[in-house]
């Protein structure tokens, strides 16, 4: 018998539509699951049990009145860098520990309009800067498959909550792999949409030319359902395009015959675990067996993506985080003068990784270094984008690893920032090019999940979702859940 916390989003939706369960019953079951496993997983920073029950009751009343909204009565979690009206939004930082937004992010407002029940806010690396959720100022989220391992980051809480059965789906954000990497490490499905597909209004910015909000869930179908709700033009975000939003769920036909899949040799990096490479190549063979045409391709500027990213992203972060000065909102530490107060506030409010990236970014933008570093990085970014454009003249989708290894032990990279940055070597090129990426579970090594990454043309999430769904129709990796101790 499937327990309520084991239901996928689409299964829960069907059960609600058929009247087999109510939203109140589903919400209570998930709150009970959170109470049972949260002491071990620690995915949530804020649990809004009272608000969730009230929303669930309202959803049941709407359904009784004939409402058929696509997410009516479905409980979801939200990464804690996305603004939620009346619910604390901390960015996992002491700087915003007590900040309560007075408005919803556009993505959250659209979820609410579609009937979703917001159950709480999820842990992440501070201001979304990290690959392990170890940079949170408040707690360490643990990988539900092995509580001594990281869940990935920065959307580690969003991934762990889905894997642990605390929520059927969540919202995460992806600046350099922060949806896809934790999805792979926690054995769930995650989608980074095309830059400009989903409004960033209400997202606390890390790197404005790279950030994107996207869904994390158990299945590709679940991600398709959520994407259709949150995608589309927004007058509050000038970078969000009016590109037509298709019916993504209708695109899940299961037929991928004739689709051309490229496998880039540069993504199989030195130091990749053999088990990871093997699982990814076996997954690609499954797609070939389903009728796809597979060929090797080259993305020659991929090796430069990591240094380019770590010039551009910190530069944008240093500008975006300048607003946290202790004057208007957030933490304020008194000082003898304005500059002393500013130094004390930012020193106490920001953790070491955030301070490191602000310093990197400020250096890259400073006089005398701008042309040598930041401007040159933007030029190489154009070459990386051009690599993808040329590749997509030959293929429809690119298939590659998501991470070079499975989840590493908590603390393994704490004293080695470069080793931590290398965890994103397979994911961050997409952000530089603004392309969509989908991760689906494709195997295990030493009891830890492995993810296959699918990369698509700009605004062609349909094809990505179609291939990912076809893969999940003939495999069962996405159906597996960890056996967690409960309290």
Curated annotation (Swiss-Prot):
It comes from Roseiflexus sp. (strain RS-1). This is Glutamyl-tRNA(Gln) amidotransferase subunit A. Allows the formation of correctly charged Gln-tRNA(Gln) through the transamidation of misacylated Glu-tRNA(Gln) in organisms which lack glutaminyl-tRNA synthetase. The reaction takes place in the presence of glutamine and ATP through an activated gamma-phospho-Glu-tRNA(Gln). It is an enzyme of class 6 (ligase). PANTHER family: GLUTAMYL-TRNA(GLN) AMIDOTRANSFERASE SUBUNIT A, TRANSAMIDASE. Pfam families: Amidase (PF01425). GO terms for cellular component: glutamyl-tRNA(Gln) amidotransferase complex. Belongs to the amidase family. GatA subfamily.
């Amino acid at each position: 018998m499937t327990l309520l916390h084991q239901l996928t989003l689409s299964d829960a939706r069907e059960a609600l539509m058929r009247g087999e369960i109510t939203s109140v019953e589903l919400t209570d079951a998930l709150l009970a699951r959170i109470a049972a496993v949260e002491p071990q997983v620690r995915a949530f920073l804020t649990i809004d049990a009272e608000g969730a029950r009230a929303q669930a009751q309202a959803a049941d009343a709407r359904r009784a009145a004939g409402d058929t909204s696509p997410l009516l009565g479905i409980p979801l979690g939200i990464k804690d860098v996305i603004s939620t009206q009346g619910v604390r939004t901390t960015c996992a930082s002491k700087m915003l520990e007590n900040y309560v937004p007075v408005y919803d992010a556009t993505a959250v407002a659209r979820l609410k309009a579609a009937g979703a029940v917001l159950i709480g806010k999820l842990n992440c690396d501070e201001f979304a800067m990290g690959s392990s959720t170890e940079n949170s100022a408040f707690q360490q989220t643990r990988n539900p498959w092995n509580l001594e391992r990281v869940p990935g980051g920065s959307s580690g809480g969003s991934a762990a909550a889905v894997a642990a059965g605390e929520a059927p789906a969540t919202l995460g954000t992806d600046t350099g792999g922060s949806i896809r990497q934790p999805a792979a490490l926690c054995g769930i499905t995650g989608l980074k949409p095309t830059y400009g597909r989903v409004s960033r209004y209400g997202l606390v910015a890390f790197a404005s030319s790279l950030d994107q909000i996207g869904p994390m869930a158990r299945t590709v179908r679940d991600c398709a359902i959520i994407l259709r709700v949150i995608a589309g033009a927004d007058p509050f975000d000038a970078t969000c395009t009016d590109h037509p939003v298709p019916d993504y769920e209708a695109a899940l036909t299961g037929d991928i015959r004739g689709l051309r899949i490229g496998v880039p040799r540069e993504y199989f990096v030195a130091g990749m675990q053999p088990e990871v490479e093997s699982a990814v190549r076996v997954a690609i063979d499954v797609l070939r067996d389903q009728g796809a045409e597979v060929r090797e391709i080259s993305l020659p500027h991929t090796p430069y993506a990591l240094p380019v990213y770590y010039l551009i992203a910190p530069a944008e972060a240093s500008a975006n985080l300048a607003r946290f000065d202790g004057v208007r909102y957030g933490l304020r530490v008194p000082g003898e003068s304005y500059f002393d107060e500013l130094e004390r506030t930012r020193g106490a409010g920001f953790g070491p990784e955030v301070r490191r990236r602000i310093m990197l970014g400020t250096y890259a933008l400073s006089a005398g270094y701008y042309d040598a570093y930041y401007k040159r990085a933007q030029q190489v970014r154009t070459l990386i984008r051009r690599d993808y454009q040329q590749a997509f003249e030959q293929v429809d989708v690119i298939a590659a690893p998501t991470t070079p290894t499975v989840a590493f032990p908590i603390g393994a990279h704490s004293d080695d920032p470069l080793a931590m940055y290398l965890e994103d070597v397979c994911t961050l090129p997409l952000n530089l090019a603004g392309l969509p990426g989908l991760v689906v579970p494709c195997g295990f090594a030493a009891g830890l999940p492995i993810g296959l990454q699918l990369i698509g043309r700009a605004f062609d999430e349909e094809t990505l979702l179609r291939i990912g769904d076809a893969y999940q129709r003939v495999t069962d990796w996405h159906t597996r859940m960890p056996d967690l101790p409960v309290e």
